[in-house]
Structure formats: structure tokens, C-alpha cells
Amino acid sequence: MFASRFKVCRQILENVWQTKKLTLKQKFLISELQKQKKNKKQSDFSIQLQTIKKLSLFYGNLPIKKMQRAKTHTYIDKKNSLLFNIEKRLDVILVRLNFCSTMFQARQLISHKNICVNYKKVNIPGFQVSNGDLISIQENSLDFFKSNIRKNFQTNRIRRMKPNHLEVNYKTLKAVVLYEPQQIQFPYKIDLDLLD
């Protein structure tokens, strides 16, 4: 794993990159740091900050300020509405549909105007998709996406289960958002109660 990515793993004390594996030396370093940290008492603020960092990394380095700003706009159920607003972003949906393997790849493809929502080109990665919106791929990019999806299925880099709130046709590479997401699965432990 690259040094810059491992630096993040050292701060959070676990591997937050789903596609990258740690070397034996890196695993040993993290386990030693975890042992040292068990002896120290963490403040509530540091635990909350670590949770927000994990969430930010899970969503491809989404700026923490954006997440906190989204949290302050909602009053009823802050943690769920924050996560569901993030889950309705176009870049996140492309990763959930397995059209892209990483958030960074999804953002790049959106900014190059390869994605359409309701047959209109969109170049904003944070575009909020509504229920019933049709997500499609530009004609000139279809071959790239099909080869990317095929490669990801062969290497098992993508999860074969798609979320229930999305309906996708992999032959035409079109998808529809059916309803609001009901449940979000994380590859590592995140205590969402700390987001209140």
C-alpha cells in the first residue's frame, strides 16, 4: 500500500481502503499502535472526529465540512438524513451500481460529462439524484463502462449485491432510483450514534 494511504490507516488504526491490502509490516505496525491506544483513554471529541474521518474516507475523501454542513441543515434525524443525503449523490450511486470501482473514478467520469441523468449531461459529482431519475451512460463511453464492469466482476473487486433502492440493467447500462435508501452497509465498524 502507498505511504500516503497507509498514513491514513495509521491515524484510524484500521484498513479503510477496501480495494488495497496491507503488507505484513504494515499490519504489524497497526496492531502495535492498537495495543498502545488501548492503554490511553480517548475523549468523546476524538472518538467522534475519528468516526467522521472514517465516514469521509468511506465516501472517497468527501470534505468533512460538507458533511457537517449537511448535518446542520436537518433537524429531525440528523445522522440518518446526513447519510441518506450522501447516498443520493451521483458519484456514490455510480459506485453502488458497480459502474465504477472507486469514488475517485466516478467523480472523474462525471466531470468529463460521461453520465446523464434523465438524458441530460451532468458534470457535478455531488448532484442529488431524486426518486424516479434515470441514470444512463453517454453513447461514446459505453464500451469503457462495459469493459470496466466485466473486469471488476472477474476480479471480484465489486460486490455482487446491489442496494435495493436501485434498479439497474447491465446490458443497456441504465439505472433508476426507486426510493430513498433504507439501510447502508459499511465495510468496517462505524458507530453512527456518535454523529448526533
Swiss-Prot record:
Per the record, what is one GO cellular component?
small ribosomal subunit
Which keywords does this chain's UniProt record carry? Mitochondrion, Ribonucleoprotein, Ribosomal protein, RNA-binding, rRNA-binding
Matching Pfam families, A to Z? S4
PROSITE patterns attached here? Answer: RIBOSOMAL_S4, S4
- Supply one GO molecular-function term: structural constituent of ribosome
The similarity comment for this entry is:
Belongs to the universal ribosomal protein uS4 family.
- PANTHER family per the record? 30S 40S RIBOSOMAL PROTEIN, SMALL RIBOSOMAL SUBUNIT PROTEIN US4M
Q: What is the protein name for this chain? A: Small ribosomal subunit protein uS4m
Domain S4 RNA-binding: from-to ranges: 88-154
Subcellular location, record wording: Mitochondrion
- Gene field: RPS4
Task: Show the NCBIfam families listed in the entry.
Answer: rpsD_bact
The cross-references to InterPro entries, in alphabetical order and at most eight, read: Ribosomal_uS4, Ribosomal_uS4_bac-type, Ribosomal_uS4_CS, S4_RNA-bd, S4_RNA-bd_sf
Task: List this protein's GO terms for biological process.
Answer: translation
